[in-house]
Every structure is written in C-alpha cells, then in structure tokens.
C-alpha cells in the first residue's frame, strides 16, 4: 500500500517500480531523463542496499535522498534481529501477515542463521511442541505491532513453560524496542488447566 500510494501521487509513467536486484540490473532509463530513487521505509535494509548499489553503478548520476529513508524503527529492529538470530533455536516475529516490516523481519532472522523463524499473527498458530524442544527463543515484533501482542505471547509461554527472559539492547534509542531471548524448560503445570 505504501508504494501504491506514493506512485499514485504523480502522473502515470513518471515512477518506475523496481522490486528486486534483477529488476535493478535490467532497468532502462528509456528517455535519458534525470533519475532519482526512494525506498519503501519498511524494506529489508540489506536487500535495499544491494539494489541501490546496482543502480548507482549503472547510473552514476542517479540522485538519492538526503538522508536514510528506511524507517529507523525498521533499521534498528532488523539490526537487532540479525544480531540475535544466530544465537537462537527458534525466532518469532509478532505481527500481521500483511505487514511488510514483519515479513521482512522473519526473512532477516532466517538469513542470519535461525532457519526456524516464523511470523506469529494469531495465538492459534503458536507451535508449543517445537518450543518445548528449544533452549533459546528470540522474539521481536513488526514496527506497527502493539506491545500488548508481544506481552500476550510471552504470557502464553509462561503459562506452559518455565522461562527466563533476557532483554537484549542493541541500540540505545528514545523509543524502546524490546527483543527477548527466552530460555525454556517444560513447566510442571498442566498447559490446559
């Protein structure tokens, strides 16, 4: 929706959408006009950097934003997930399936070494059987996910397992984005009762 909204602000044909490295390699400045780029604020920082490198190499005169246009919350969360995922048996991103930020965070966790990473958009899909066999679990959320969803997820785990929460701070900000590592062991309580 963000890209569609931006493209709709200008006359048809005045903006070209480049969605991946292959499209960046094939892009043609048909009319030889001055060109510039902007990026969707919730894209993967790493993926965006590669596309930008390709465009800059092909079009040295290309204009770019005066400052980083990836949302700082997105950048910081991706950096935190990247840093922590390699230590985890499982990684959960709490967020919506239609949130590109949340979906990208799952991709970042997988690329960073935690293959068993997944998006949790509903209590009904929490994989408790897999969690009970894990020692270290990473948790983060999409930028627009309310903190209460993360708290509810952790509460659900506490009801089934004995856990230790270790909040990891990667970057000091005025706005806090908590990333948790959970150390699990089976809870003596009946998970149903």
Where are these regions (language model features)?
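Single conserved hydrophobic/aromatic residue that forms the stacking wall/gate
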Residues: 183-193
């Amino acid at each position: 929706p963000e890209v569609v909204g931006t493209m709709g602000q200008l006359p048809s044909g005045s903006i070209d959408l480049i969605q991946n490295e292959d499209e960046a390699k094939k892009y043609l400045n048909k009319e030889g006009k001055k060109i510039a780029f902007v990026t969707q604020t919730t894209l993967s920082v790493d993926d965006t950097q590669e596309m930008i490198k390709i465009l800059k190499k092909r079009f040295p005169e290309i204009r770019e934003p005066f400052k980083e246009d990836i949302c700082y919350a997105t950048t910081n969360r991706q950096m935190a997930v990247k840093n922590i995922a390699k230590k985890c048996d499982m990684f959960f991103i709490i967020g919506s399936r239609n949130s590109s930020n949340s979906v990208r965070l799952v991709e970042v966790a997988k690329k960073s070494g935690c293959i068993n990473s997944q998006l949790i958009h509903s209590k009904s899909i929490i994989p408790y059987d897999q969690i009970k066999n894990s020692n270290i679990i990473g948790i983060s959320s999409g930028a627009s996910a309310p903190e209460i969803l993360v708290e509810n997820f952790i509460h659900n785990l506490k009801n089934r397992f004995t856990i230790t929460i270790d909040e990891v701070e990667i970057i000091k900000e005025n706005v806090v984005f908590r990333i948790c590592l959970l150390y699990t062991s089976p809870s003596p309580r009946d998970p149903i009762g």
